[in-house]
Curated annotation (Swiss-Prot):
Involved in transcription antitermination. Required for transcription of ribosomal RNA (rRNA) genes. Binds specifically to the boxA antiterminator sequence of the ribosomal RNA (rrn) operons. InterPro entries: NusB-like_sf, NusB_fam, NusB_RsmB_TIM44. GO terms for molecular function: RNA binding. Signal peptide: none annotated. PANTHER family: ANTITERMINATION NUSB DOMAIN-CONTAINING PROTEIN, N UTILIZATION SUBSTANCE PROTEIN B-RELATED. One of its GO terms (cellular component) is cytosol. NCBIfam families: nusB. Belongs to the NusB family. HAMAP family: NusB (MF_00073). GO terms for biological process: DNA-templated transcription termination; transcription antitermination. This is Transcription antitermination protein NusB.
Length: 133
């Protein structure tokens, strides 16, 4: 199972959940039913843990993000970057299995793939601020 790919798919699913009203169970079920590659490559248990964890802790996660923004408001963050931040903040604050540096580095790699260079610096700054507290 590929944790890096699983984390990326979890972010994509979180993004999808911001665009529709499906809960994490429905989102994951639809994803599994429609996934066209080898599902064995993915850690479905990990993806489910991320989706449920972010959904259950969203207020706390968003508060942590908001407190660590410099001259920004959370509603100004692009949906993609917000989903990346939510995933990483969940791992930093609520998932002891993932080392903090891994959570940050993986978030930055996902940001490079799905966003732009300015966003990489932005995401890194927010996550570093959260880690310092």
């Amino acid at each position: 199972m590929n944790r890096k790919l699983s984390r990326e798919k979890a972010m994509e699913l979180l993004f999808g959940m911001t665009l529709n009203t499906d809960n994490c169970e429905e989102t994951l079920e639809n994803f599994i039913d429609n996934y066209e590659s080898d599902i064995k490559e993915l850690d479905i248990t990990y993806i489910k843990r991320i989706l449920i964890g972010v959904e259950n802790n969203k207020d706390n996660i968003d508060e942590s993000i908001s407190k660590n923004l410099c001259n920004w408001k959370i509603d100004r963050i692009s949906k993609v970057n917000l989903c990346i931040l939510r995933l990483a903040v969940y791992e930093l604050l609520h998932d002891e299995e993932i080392p903090n540096r891994v959570a940050i580095n993986e978030a930055l790699e996902i940001t490079k793939k799905y966003s732009d260079e300015k966003s990489v610096s932005f995401v890194n700054g927010v996550l570093d601020n959260i880690l310092k507290k």
